[in-house]
Amino acid sequence: MSERKFFGTDGIRGKVGSGQMTPELALKLGWAAGRVLSRSGTKKVIIGKDTRISGYMFESALEAGLSAAGLNVMLMGPMPTPAVAYLTRTFRAEAGVVISASHNPYYDNGIKFFSTDGSKLDDNLELEIEAELEKPLVCVESHLLGKVSRIEDARGRYIEYCKGNFPADQTLTGLKIVVDCAHGATYHIAPAVFRELGAEVIAIGDKPNGVNINDKVGATSMAKICETVLAETADLGIALDGDGDRIMMVNSKGEVIDGDQILYILACDAKARGVLRGGVVGTLMSNLGLDLALQALDIPFARSKVGDRYVMELLKELDWRIGGENSGHILNLDHGTTGDGIVAGILVLAAMRRQNATLEQLTAPMEMLPQVLVNVRFEGEHDPLSSDKVKAAQAQVESELGVRGRVLLRKSGTEPLIRVMVEGDDHNTVLAHANLIADAVKSAS
């Protein structure tokens, strides 16, 4: 595959106004994408965004570029990433575009594309778009320019879709739920979904102002929702990230329920209903406790590289349906084509209702093992992981941990760091083992 200049594993992302994230590039990107997408299909593209102040600027630039290439544009306004994927499918659009940097701060932004079926755009199409970016922008003739319209009922369509994933014979009546929208794209969606299903909802992180997205709220900053669940004596909390593709939960004791535990709940529920196809895909960072808990139920478990893109690839390769990351990206291919925080929350609530159980009861059989991560900086071009000293330290630790422990050593893809991760039954022992390996890495640096 050719080397990419613009697209990363999750579209284009960076600090606004520098590097690639400029209105100039967005205009050219819209035109280049329009050139590629106009070769077939409906010549219709949907654009959604999160609540960052820069979203308006990039939306206008993309809209102009796509129109200049002859594509019609349908604007959704602030909507979650999975909503763009869903409406791209239902409108039979040629593509969907999301303007978001997900869980990053407001001063970052990004652009990514969905294909007509709501999945991430094919690698070859991204390379074709990159090739067009190298050409001068030439506008189509005036009578061929694309038209721009707004999807006025986008919010209502997506709310109904989300609710459709909950059993029709059940309600959430009697449940008090804290919902944290991260001041992001779900602020006008998530509280409504859970209220319309019958829950009493206390919304936080639901007042975006353009610069407060993910700021001390949301799935990457759990302190506030944990405090609110306890203060309001709520049954549980649901925390989403800025673009709504990630979820973390909180039980009534104020304890965080992460992506691994959510995967366990969904797998158990699917197995109990006889609808589990194959097993569960996690990542190299998934807690060993998930692996062991699924083993006890004879549910296969496989690990992909870190990143929801790689989880999806392995799910498709194995023809399984459920997978995700401990960070809260949850994929259930029976309920969508991409990670969807609201839908994942609904599926957990459905499991609670079906089993007449609390969140604590559903996660109780899964023991989360202590996990320690140590980052070791190294200098030079050599690879510390090839050192005999490091290999010997790893072998010693793995021997002492046995089947109830795990060691993972990997290089950072962005910094000169070796990440040392150790899991086991006892935190102090795990910490000592991690430091032992880290010291070996340092001495080999």
Curated annotation (Swiss-Prot):
Is the Phosphoprotein keyword given for this protein?
Answer: yes
Catalytic site: 102 (phosphoserine intermediate)
Keywords from the named record: Isomerase, Magnesium, Metal-binding, Phosphoprotein
| Source taxon at top rank | Bacteria
**PROSITE patterns in the record, alphabetically?**
PGM_PMM
Q: What are its GO biological-process terms?
A: carbohydrate metabolic process; peptidoglycan biosynthetic process; UDP-N-acetylglucosamine biosynthetic process
Any idea which positions bind Mg(2+)?
Answer: 102, 241, 243, 245
* Residues bearing PTM Phosphoserine: 102
Catalytic function, reaction form:
alpha-D-glucosamine 1-phosphate = D-glucosamine 6-phosphate
User: Which free-text remark accompanies the cofactor?
Assistant: Binds 1 Mg(2+) ion per subunit.
Keyword Isomerase part of the UniProt annotation: yes
Free-text description of this protein's post-translational modifications in UniProt? Activated by phosphorylation.
| Gene Ontology MF terms in the entry | magnesium ion binding; phosphoglucosamine mutase activity; phosphomannomutase activity
**Which stretches are transmembrane?**
none
The cofactor named in the record is: Mg(2+)
Enzyme Commission designation: 5.4.2.10
Matching Pfam families: PGM_PMM_I, PGM_PMM_II, PGM_PMM_III, PGM_PMM_IV
Q: Which GO terms describe its cellular component?
A: cytosol
Family, similarity comment: Belongs to the phosphohexose mutase family.
Q: Which PANTHER family match?
A: PHOSPHOGLUCOMUTASE (ALPHA-D-GLUCOSE-1,6-BISPHOSPHATE-DEPENDENT), PHOSPHOHEXOSE MUTASE
Protein function:
Catalyzes the conversion of glucosamine-6-phosphate to glucosamine-1-phosphate.
Q: Please report the name of this protein according to its UniProt entry.
A: Phosphoglucosamine mutase
Q: What organism does the record attribute this protein to?
A: Shewanella oneidensis (strain ATCC 700550 / JCM 31522 / CIP 106686 / LMG 19005 / NCIMB 14063 / MR-1)
This chain is encoded by the gene named glmM
